[in-house]
Amino acid sequence: MRFRYFLVKKDWRSTMVQNSCWQSKSHKVKAFTLLESLLALIVISGGLLLFQAMSQLLISEVRYQQQSEQKEWLLFVDQLEVELDRSQFEKVEGNRLYMKQDGKDIAIGKSKSDDFRKTNARGRGYQPMVYGLKSVRITEDNQLVRFHFQFQKGLEREFIYRVEKEKS
């Protein structure tokens, strides 16, 4: 690309500058206008505010779920304690606790699914006490029955209960 230089003895540089300005005026330069820039800033700001609001909502939901799990555990422990208080301990066998309640043989332990149930001694009947269990380990040692619970969500809890064996 060759440029034409107008040779004017007096000031050839000013003529060249005028020529280049004239050329740039004839071509449209693509750029953002002030209105477009303002609109882009508003869209970006709105997107960031939306992202912040969604993050706070997610954090509050996680906190609620953690509190809900804790409340569910406390409710289960209260229910289990009531069942154990009104029963007479017999034995722990096969990861199940066997006891007598109101003259009936009762067993509590983890079922084949993901819940902890109260059943009769033969495994019949159905009263779920807590859901979402991965595993349960029930052991008895020196009049202490230990329940070790692992939940599917990663929560681990242990419940220890003192029993009195009936003297024969």
Curated annotation (Swiss-Prot):
Recorded superkingdom: Bacteria
Compartments, record wording: Cell membrane; Fimbrium
GO cellular component, one term: pilus
A Pfam family recorded for this sequence: ComGF
Membrane topology designation: Single-pass membrane protein
Consequence the record notes for mutating residue 36 to A: Does not impair pilus formation or function
Main location: membrane
Keywords: Cell membrane, Competence, Fimbrium, Membrane, Transmembrane, Transmembrane helix
Protein name listed in UniProt: Competence protein ComGF
Native source species: Streptococcus pneumoniae (strain ATCC BAA-255 / R6)
The encoding gene: comGF
